[in-house]
């Protein structure tokens, strides 16, 4: 038996198929993964993401410490509520984790991956040194993600007028405190929506309200196909300690300036950049019948081989898509080995669908 979120019994009552995910018992789907996927793209749905880890960074030197810890620069965050995406690297520029960082009224809030929480916290504590910084793991909080083009409108109808106004005014990649709730306009689906951190007992009530109002519960299966269509990395598959952000479509999240900011992993990244990154993360589209899966070999004629990191059937596109790490010189065509046969694939930018629009 794995760890359970505060909503475990509600998932069972809704008929969820439960699976292990990073040591947590989580809902894979509530009947049809494909229908749940379409529901989020076309309207909205609610995910239980209480397995994610929330860590508050407090103290006089929180900003200075995070500027050393992270590849992106929290100095960009000038107004409480603003957020950014960053990798946390080791000295060899391997990705320990990726996360969202919010500037709050009294410090910073980090939202890190479920399976890496203990590892992340141990690494952070090992890097504290003499910094005047306190780390507070907010394990008492639950987290719901309401995602889809109608998410904010639907939620605004179910909360107080003051909270509804806050939701309407939130900008993308912004999160604000509202009493015991922290409401952010972020997500992992490629659609607009909210991620709400709130006390566990309130999460149960609110989840029931959402479902009672006709907002469909969505499982991890659809969450995975939604994020894959959006070209969003999954830790442990597309990124990890074995690979740098330069080979993971994450170069945009590295703050190279100011040059004197000596973040962990910078020296290794600069060496890699100077020598030239050997691999890149791309999107693949299979035009024939078949399914692209992680670890399938990608062959690029006269250049070399790579590997699929994530792959699945795309419900939106009605064809198989994948993220793959391939040689840097790869152009627009490659082949993938599926059950001993080679199939041609198109090589595209690693984003297939966002905000309901096809990008390939």
UniProtKB/Swiss-Prot annotation:
Record's keyword terms, sorted: Aminotransferase, Transferase
MF-aspect GO terms: aminomethyltransferase activity; transaminase activity
Gene Ontology biological-process entries: glycine decarboxylation via glycine cleavage system
InterPro entries in UniProt: GCS_T, GCS_T_bac, GCST_C, GCV_T_N, GcvT/YgfZ/DmdA, GcvT/YgfZ_C, TrmE/GcvT_dom1
GO cellular component, one term: glycine cleavage complex
Root EC class: transferase
Catalytic activity: N(6)-[(R)-S(8)-aminomethyldihydrolipoyl]-L-lysyl-[protein] + (6S)-5,6,7,8-tetrahydrofolate = N(6)-[(R)-dihydrolipoyl]-L-lysyl-[protein] + (6R)-5,10-methylene-5,6,7,8-tetrahydrofolate + NH4(+)
Spans traversing the lipid bilayer: none
Xref: SUPFAM superfamilies: Aminomethyltransferase beta-barrel domain, Folate-binding domain
Keyword check for Membrane: no
Record-listed E.C. numbers: 2.1.2.10
Pfam annotation, one family: GCV_T_C
Function comment: The glycine cleavage system catalyzes the degradation of glycine.
Record note on quaternary structure: The glycine cleavage system is composed of four proteins: P, T, L and H.
Family stated for the protein in its record: Belongs to the GcvT family.
PANTHER family: AMINOMETHYLTRANSFERASE (PTHR43757), AMINOMETHYLTRANSFERASE, MITOCHONDRIAL (PTHR43757:SF2)
Identification of the protein by name: Aminomethyltransferase
Organism: Pseudomonas syringae pv. tomato (strain ATCC BAA-871 / DC3000)
